[in-house]
């Protein structure tokens, strides 16, 4: 089941491009915290051509504090995934609904982008980092996590 979901999410992210820039569709106010376990990473660069590495082959860490907060109609805050995505002014795509949270940020000057999607039901998170966007030799890291919601303590 996770492999099927991973493939669907991966295809969705890979087909997702800057033509959707400025897309904002925040349908719900959310304030969620997750603890996410690294599952695998796919690397595409001059050394690896979409090679998959399992969590135990990587130095990458789990996400202990991944937080999402949205406020209708257009605010989305991300914390704990990457410093780049934590800068909410960089977000060009923000989608929040009952099923998924999807976001993308880009820096044209640095030729760099990051995007991610989390399935709110399954907890599957896919984070894509793209370097050298404008080049034929763009580089990608696609990281898969399995996340569980953290209960808020009152």
Predicted regions and their residues:
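N-terminal glycine/threonine-rich, aromatic-flanked beta-hairpin/loop signature
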Residues: 51-88, 124-131
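Tryptophan-anchored aromatic micro-motifs
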Residues: 24-52, 147-148
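Generic short beta-strand segments
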Residues: 35-44, 106, 127-132
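Classical Sec-dependent N-terminal signal peptides that target proteins to the secretory pathway
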Residues: 1-26
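Edge beta-strand at a domain terminus
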Residues: 129-154
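Contiguous, well-ordered beta-strand patches that form the walls/edges
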Residues: 71-118
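Hydrophobic/aromatic beta-strand elements that line small-molecule binding cavities or substrate pockets
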Residues: 113-120, 143-149
């Amino acid at each position: 089941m996770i492999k099927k979901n991973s493939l669907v999410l991966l295809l969705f992210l890979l087909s997702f491009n800057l033509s959707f820039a400025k897309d904002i569709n925040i349908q719900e106010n959310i304030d969620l915290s997750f603890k996410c376990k690294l599952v695998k990473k796919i690397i595409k660069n001059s050394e690896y051509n979409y090679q998959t590495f399992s969590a135990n082959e990587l130095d990458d860490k789990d996400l202990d504090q991944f937080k999402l907060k949205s406020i209708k109609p257009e605010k989305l805050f991300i914390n704990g995934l990457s410093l780049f995505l934590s800068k909410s002014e960089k977000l060009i795509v923000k989608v929040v609904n009952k099923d998924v949270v999807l976001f993308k940020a880009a820096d044209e000057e640095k030729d760099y982008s990051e995007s991610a999607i989390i399935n709110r039901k399954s907890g599957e998170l896919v984070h894509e980092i793209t370097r050298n966007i404008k080049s034929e030799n763009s580089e990608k890291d696609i990281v898969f996590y399995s996340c569980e919601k953290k209960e808020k303590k009152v």
